From Swiss-Prot:
Species name: Vibrio vulnificus (strain YJ016)
Matches recorded under InterPro entries: Exonuc_VII_L (IPR003753), Exonuc_VII_lsu_C (IPR020579), OB-fold_nuc-bd_dom (IPR025824)
Localization (cell): Cytoplasm
Superkingdom of source: Bacteria
UniProt protein name: Exodeoxyribonuclease 7 large subunit
Family of this protein: Belongs to the XseA family.
A GO BP annotation: DNA catabolic process
Length: 443
């Protein structure tokens, strides 16, 4: 049965496509903490790397449009927090993450906790404008919940003294930083509600890092603020600092000094109602913008999943992979060629005429030396043989006989006289001795 006519039989490409859509549509956005390894940044500007922990790892891709927003350059070994979409790289069937944002793990964990608590409390309606209490237009007594030694307290008191010196103030001192701060802040709010001596509370502190302000992002503090029967103005840090307490409070002031202005009548008779309404309008507008932004983000994610850019991204990733494979292949090819050239050079050195001539000269020198040694040995043997022969000849030589006292008589012509019949009267004879000769005449 053909796979083209039976819908229950998948091709590999169709299976990978279905799995990719399933991952992207069902799981959506995930937050992930891990260590970067195998980091690569090709000329395309995209980033490819692996996120791992002690037990597992997953491949990741972060495209140029997103990674240019990262405030640091990742390196192998970095611990990071990433926001990602699950996907599948269809050509290889590799499950991977498409990274949308990245930050160092320390700040990232706090931000992740912040976002999670914000979403949780928002879903319960703690941020809803309908649940917020109105700030009294002309408070009769103001409660301040902050550190008794912090600059925020003195800023608030200075503003109140300048604007409305007759306004009564009750200070509820508490820690505003550290592990015990959240409990103490919640207890101070509860104490102010129990005593019920103020008709508005300012809860806050001066500026600081995310860690310094973290007690105002605590769920206990948030729920205590929401449960307060006395209206609360949050005044945490500077205008750019935003905490969970700001969302839960009945009104948010950008600074402690601004909070003091909101609860005091200006000597120049500023319209406090207008300021309060402006603050409420700002809060409502921020809430509206937050909701609209969440809707836009959701719609953009849905739109992006159908956008041709994703196809282009996948093709770009495939092109980057091919580029990396080509580069590795070229490096391997060049290494093999270098090895081959090295072997050929070695062979050429072995076949070099200069080398051969040198070896032949050395061989001839060895042969010449062997011949000289052989000739010397031959001459030595011949001399020895001649000496032996000379000794033998010497033993039978007439001269040796003469040395023993004998003599040889010859005629004048050199004929040896061995018989008397060989001579006659008047012949001249020569007698040879060992040391000379004697001439005589026969009578």
């Amino acid at each position: 049965m053909s796979s083209l006519t039976n819908p229950n039989i998948f091709t590999v490409s169709r299976l990978n496509s279905e799995v990719r859509l399933l991952l992207e549509n069902q799981l959506g956005i995930v937050w992930l903490v891990g260590e970067i390894s195998n980091f690569s940044a090709p000329v395309s500007g995209h980033w490819y790397f692996t996120l791992k922990d002690s037990m597992a790892q997953v491949k990741c891709a972060m495209f140029r449009g997103n990674n240019r927003l990262v405030s640091f350059k990742p390196t192998n070994g970095n611990q990071v927090l990433v926001k990602a979409r699950l996907s599948l790289y269809e050509p290889r069937g590799d499950y991977q993450l498409i990274i949308e944002s990245m930050q160092p793990e320390g700040d990232g964990r706090l931000q992740q906790q912040f976002d999670a608590l914000k979403m949780k409390l928002a879903s319960e309606g703690l941020f809803a404008q309908s649940s917020k209490q109105a700030i009294p237009e002309h408070p009769k007594c103001v409660g301040i919940i902050t550190s008794k030694t912090g600059a925020a307290l003195y800023d608030i008191l200075d503003v109140l003294k300048r604007r409305d010196p007759s306004l009564p103030v009750v200070i509820y001192p508490t820690l505003v930083q550290g592990e015990e701060a959240a409990i103490q802040i919640a207890q101070a709010i509860g104490r102010a509600n129990s005593r019920n001596e103020c008709d508005v509370l300012i809860v806050g502190r001066g500026g600081g890092s995310l860690e310094d302000l973290w007690c105002f992002n605590n769920e206990i503090v948030a729920r205590t603020i929401a449960a307060s029967q006395i209206p609360i103005i949050s005044a945490v840090g500077h205008e750019i600092d935003v905490t969970i307490a700001d969302f839960v409070a009945d009104l948010r002031a950008p600074t402690p000094s601004a909070a003091a202005e909101l609860v005091s009548r200006d000597n120049s008779h500023k319209d406090q109602a207008l300021i309060s309404r402006e603050q409420k309008l700002r809060a409502a507008w921020r809430h509206y913008l937050t909701e609209q932004n969440r809707t836009i983000v959701s719609l953009s994610h849905r739109l992006e999943k159908q956008h041709p850019r994703y196809r282009l991204m996948r093709q770009t990733q495939q092109a980057d992979e091919l580029q990396i494979r080509l580069q590795r292949a070229m490096e391997k090819y060049l290494a093999q060629r270098e090895q081959k050239v090295s072997r050929v050079q070695h062979k050429l050195q072995l076949l070099s005429p200069v080398r051969q001539i040198s070896e032949q000269k050395n061989a001839l020198a060895r042969v010449e030396q062997k011949m000289m040694d052989a000739m010397d040995r031959k001459l030595l043997r011949l001399r020895h043989q001649i000496a032996i022969a000379a000794e033998k000849l010497d033993t039978v030589s007439p001269l040796a006989t003469l040395k023993r006292g004998y003599s040889i008589t010859q005629s004048e012509s050199g004929e040896v006289i061995t018989r008397q019949s060989q001579i006659k009267t008047g012949d001249t004879l020569v007698t040879r001795l060992s040391d000379g000769e004697i001439r005589s005449t026969v009578n």
